[in-house]
Structures are given as C-alpha cells and as structure tokens.
Amino acid sequence: MMDAPLLAIENLRTYFYSRPKRAFIRSVDGVSLHVAPGETLGIVGESGSGKSVTALSAAGLVSAAPGVIGGRIELRSRQARRNLLDGLERYVRVKERDGRITAVEKDDRGWRRRAETLMEGVRGKEIAMIFQNPRSALNPYSTIGAQLVETIRLHTSAKGEGEARERAIHWLERVRIDSPRLRFDNFPFGMSGGMCQRAMIAMALSAEPSLLIADEPTTGLDATIQSRIVDLLAQLKIETGITTLLISHDISVIQRLADRIAVMYGGTVVETGRAAEVLAPQAQVRHPYTAALLASVPSPETIRRKSYLQAIEGEVLDTIEVPRGCRFYGRCNRVTEAIRENCAGREPPLGEVATGHKVRCWLYPATGKA
C-alpha cells in the first residue's frame, strides 16, 4: 500500500499576463502531482514547460499577477495536513470565451494576506528551496555563516547564538565545504559558484524541512562541479531521507536522483511513473514527447558513432493559444490516421497504462481509464 503523499498537488493553475500580447499565459494549467515521504520526484521538460513555476507555486513564491488562480496544494506537515491554497479561490474569478481566457479578476491584496497566513510556519521550516542561481539567492551583504545562523535560529530549536553557529558549521561540513570554520565568515562573492550552491543546500537542509524543492540545482555550473553537486545530493538523500521535488531539464540528473518522474509539456503533465520504467531504453509505452527528449540526449553510442543528436522539431508550445487537442500534436511524429482526429480535437486524459505509470496520449487505449 502506497504511503499517503507528503505533498499532493491537484489541478494547479498558475497564469501570467503578457502586456505586449494582451493575453494570459497558462504557465501551469491543471497540473496534478504527488510525492511520497522519502521519495524524490523529478520533473523534466524543455524550458517553458512549467516546471519551475510549478515548484515556485508549491513554495508560495509566485509574485507576478495573476499568479496561482486555482487548485490544491496539500502538505502533510509535522503538525497536520493542510491545503496551502485553502480559501484562496474566493479571491479569484476567471472569465473564458471559446477556450480563451478573457479576464482574471483577482483581489490581489486579500489573496496575498490569505496566502501569507497559510504559508506562515511552512516556507523555510516545512518547505525549503534550492534555487538555480545561488549567487542571486544568497544575500551579498551578509556572510554565509550569518545567513545560516539566521535560518537555524528562526526555524529550529537551537538555543542561542553559540549553538546555532556550531550547527551552521556542522552543515557546512556535511555539504563538503573545505575548512568550514573559515568559510563561515566568507561573503558569497568570495566563493565559487559550486561552493555557493553547497552553501545554499546547507541553508535549505539546516532547518530540517519536510520537503526540499531543488529547482535546476546544477544549471550554470561546469560539468565537473555539476557531477559533484549531484553526488552530494545523492549522498544527502541517503543520509537524511529528505522528500524532494527535483526540477531539471537535464535527464541525466533526473536519472541519477529521482525515484519517480513527471514529464511536463505546455503547462501539463504528459507522463508520470517510476523513473527506471519511464526512462528505460527498452520501454514499450512512452509518450512521444518523452521519447523525443530522450532521443536528444547524447549517449555513449551516439558519441562513438559521431552521429548528430535528434532535435525536437518545431517550437515549444505558446500557452497563450492552447490547442483544443493534444498540446504536443503540432510537433509529434507518431500521429497515425486512426487517431489524428482525436489528437487534433480532443485533449487526451492522463490515463494509467500500467501500475503507477500514466501517459497523456491517444496512442494508448488504456488512456481512456483515467
């Protein structure tokens, strides 16, 4: 029997407004995900697929209007299970015509007050986040040690400055920062990108959160440092058993760290299942988009043959003009005459094709059992 999820996202919708185009962008459009205690769920997809916006929505960090306009984000915290979007729907009203959003009326001030009340004691304490650019996430005017001490004193039972300092040094040591007592007094500008990312990881885990969100934690680092950060995250997962939501466009990172995977395209989840099953080379059932992503990744075989990588034809879906049918239809190379009408005119449900494996595609008849 599967454990009750620590994080359950249901029908999440997060939209933004484009002033140049005078239209709403459906960045996250009906996403449902769950993460079990101790599990790492990897979310993968091209830039613009909605991965990071999903993560930021879960952490309550979407600030641009209209932002999160609907859904449920349930977190099983140390105290109780709570819906982090509870009651927010009364502050939002969406108007649509012919499948296109014409207006979003939102009491932004009331929404923010309610959202901050819901996130009180959650952000930082129950949910911690590693950002893709550690230099911009760290305070440039404060030492690494001071930022760690502040986090520890705010979110843990540490008694006094001295105990918080020792805990901070302990975490710098755990993330493999050399000479942690000396680095404690360093400012971010005096540390490399990889070292800043290690400090960010230490800061996130020092509060002993229930859920860690890692948003592109290796982006912007050179290949050697990327590998070391991935090794570090893998080791910390073993040591702490932390539940993790991992965002990446790098499938090799997902393969290394994730227990389950969710593939996103055009603001929706198109495939989800155990990582070993979804990413297996011999997989018989796979969403065409997942297959295209895997085909674009270099392998020892393609390197040996010096063959070209397979690019995904076309452009990433513009989620302003969402098609009536499958969102990948315009780029899909597996459409047959038998399913073309469905692909063009009806969005497929996310249906179970095997135990724990779901695919949003008309190629698989089992999709009808969503």
Predicted regions, residues:
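ABC-type ATPase nucleotide-binding domains, specifically the catalytic core motifs of the NBD
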Residues: 16-21, 62-65, 77-119, 146-163, ...
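Charged, flexible cofactor/metal-binding loops and thiol motifs
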Residues: 81-85, 98-105, 275-370
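Conserved ABC ATPase "signature" region
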Residues: 163-182, 291-295
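A short, proline-enriched helix->beta-strand linker immediately N-terminal to the Walker B motif
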Residues: 206-210
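Catalytic Walker B motif of ABC-type/P-loop ATPase nucleotide-binding domains
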Residues: 212-215
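P-loop NTP-binding/switch modules centered on Walker-like glycine-rich loops
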Residues: 221-305
